[in-house]
Curated annotation (Swiss-Prot):
Keyword Cytoplasm among UniProt keywords: no
Organism whose genome encodes this protein: Xanthobacter autotrophicus (strain ATCC BAA-1158 / Py2)
Usage in biotechnology: This enzyme and the derivative PCM-F, a variant in which the alpha and beta subunits are fused into a single polypeptide via a short 11-amino acid linker, have potential applications in bioremediation of pivalic acid found in sludge, in stereospecific synthesis of C5 carboxylic acids and alcohols, and in the production of potential commodity and specialty chemicals.
Disulfide bonding pattern of the chain: none
Subunit structure: Monomer in the absence of the PCM large subunit. Weakly interacts with the PCM large subunit; an alpha(2)beta(2) stoichiometry seems to represent the active state of the enzyme.
MF-aspect GO terms: cobalamin binding; metal ion binding; pivalyl-CoA mutase activity
Binding, adenosylcob(III)alamin: 21
Occurrences of domain B12-binding (ranges): 8-138
SUPFAM superfamilies the record matches: Cobalamin (vitamin B12)-binding domain (SSF52242)
Family as reported in the entry's similarity comment: Belongs to the acyl-CoA mutase small subunit family.
Catalytically driven reaction(s): 3-methylbutanoyl-CoA = 2,2-dimethylpropanoyl-CoA
Name the record gives this protein: Pivalyl-CoA mutase small subunit
Keywords: Cobalamin, Cobalt, Isomerase, Metal-binding, Plasmid
C-alpha cells in the first residue's frame, strides 16, 4: 500500500556533493512516481543544509540520495543534521556505486538501505513504501507523546 494516511508518501530524491550524474536518480524517481508516490526531485549539487531545509518544508517521509562517486561519504553528516532538525524519523536510502566496505558506515549512521546498480524496481518501491509508512507512524507517535 503506497498511501499511509490520507496523502501519498512523499519522497525527496536528491544528490548531495559535487556528483552531477543523475540518470539513476531520474529512473528511481520515475519508479516511485509510477507507484503513486509524490516525488520531490532536486537538481544535482545540493548541500546538506539545503536538503534538510527542503525535507522540512516538503514534509517528506523518505529521502533518497544518489551517489555515483564518493558523495555517499558525506551522508553520515547529513544524517546528523536531519536528527538535529527533528527529522530523525525520516527514512533515508542511498543508491549508486557504494563499495561494500563503506556500506556499514552508512548503516551505522542511520541509512536504512543501500541500493546498487541494477536494483529491481519492485525492491526499491517496497523498501521506500515500508520506510515511508514507518516514518509516518514514528511521527504520529512523537506527536502523541509530546501532546498527551
Amino acid at each position: 500500500m503506497i498511501h499511509a494516511g490520507t496523502r501519498p508518501l512523499r519522497v525527496l530524491v536528491t544528490k548531495i556533493g559535487l556528483d552531477g550524474h543523475d540518470r539513476g536518480s531520474r529512473i528511481v524517481a520515475a519508479y516511485l512516481r509510477d507507484a503513486g508516490m509524490e516525488v520531490i526531485y532536486t537538481p544535482p549539487w545540493q548541500t546538506i543544509p539545503g536538503v534538510v531545509k527542503l525535507a522540512t518544508e516538503e514534509d517528506v517521509d523518505v529521502i533518497g540520495i544518489s551517489s555515483l562517486a564518493t558523495d555517499h561519504l558525506i551522508v553520515p553528516k547529513m544524517m546528523e543534521a536531519l536528527r538535529a532538525a527533528g527529522l530523525g524519523h525520516v527514512g533515508v536510502v542511498v543508491g549508486g556505486i557504494v563499495p561494500e566496505a563503506e556500506q556499514s558506515a552508512l548503516a551505522a549512521a542511520g541509512v536504512s538501505r543501500v541500493f546498487g546498480p541494477g536494483a529491481a524496481r519492485e525492491e526499491i518501491v517496497e523498501c521506500v513504501t515500508a520506510l515511508g509508512q514507518k516514518s509516518r507512524a514514528e511521527r504520529v507517535d512523537d506527536y502523541s507523546e509530546a501532546n498527551p
